[in-house]
C-alpha cells in the first residue's frame, strides 16, 4: 500500500472504532502505530487488562479486583515516580477478542485525568512484505482547570505514544525471539 491508501485504511478504522462524544471542556485525539509483529502476538499483550505493565512503561504494579477478566473489571494501577500521580483506578469497558478492541475508563486516582476513556484497536496489515499490526489508540478527557486543550492533548498524546512505542518494542522483540527459536 502507498501512503494515501494506508491513510485511507487508518481513517476507516478510526471512523468505525474510535468515535468519542465530546463536550466543550474536553479534548480528544487518535494516535497510530505500525508494529512489525503479527496481530495475535500484539493482541496477546494488549488484552491483558490485568498486566498493563508488560508494555506500559509508566506502570509499576497492577491489581485487578476479582478473578475474572471481563467488561466491568476494575484495576488499581500504581504509577512510577516522575509522573504527577501515583495511582489510578480503571474499569474495563470493552474487551472484544474478535475485533481486537480494548477500552478503559479511569474512575479514580490522584491525577488530573478526569472523565478519561481510551480505546485501542488492532488490525492486521502487511509491513515490508511481512505480517504486521496497525495499532490505533484514541482518548477523550476533561481539560483540567488551569490548562488548555492543547496542553492536555499534548500531555496525554505523549503518554500514549510512549505506550505504543513500548508495545512495538516488546512485541517486535518477542517476534524476533520466536523466529530465532524456529531456526
From Swiss-Prot:
This is Abscisic acid receptor PYL10. Receptor for abscisic acid (ABA) required for ABA-mediated responses such as stomatal closure and germination inhibition. Inhibits the activity of group-A protein phosphatases type 2C (PP2Cs) in an ABA-independent manner but more efficiently when activated by ABA. Can be activated by both (-)-ABA and (+)-ABA. It is found in: Cytoplasm; Nucleus; Cell membrane. CDD domains: PYR_PYL_RCAR_like. Disulfide bonds join 27-153. The gene is PYL10. A motif (Latch loop) lies at residues 111-113. It comes from Arabidopsis thaliana (Mouse-ear cress). The keyword Disulfide bond applies. Keywords: Abscisic acid signaling pathway, Cell membrane, Cytoplasm, Disulfide bond, Membrane, Nucleus, Protein phosphatase inhibitor, Receptor. Upon interaction with ABA, the 'latch' and 'gate' loops change in conformation leading to a tight dimerization and the creation a surface that enables the receptor to dock into and inhibit the PP2C active site.
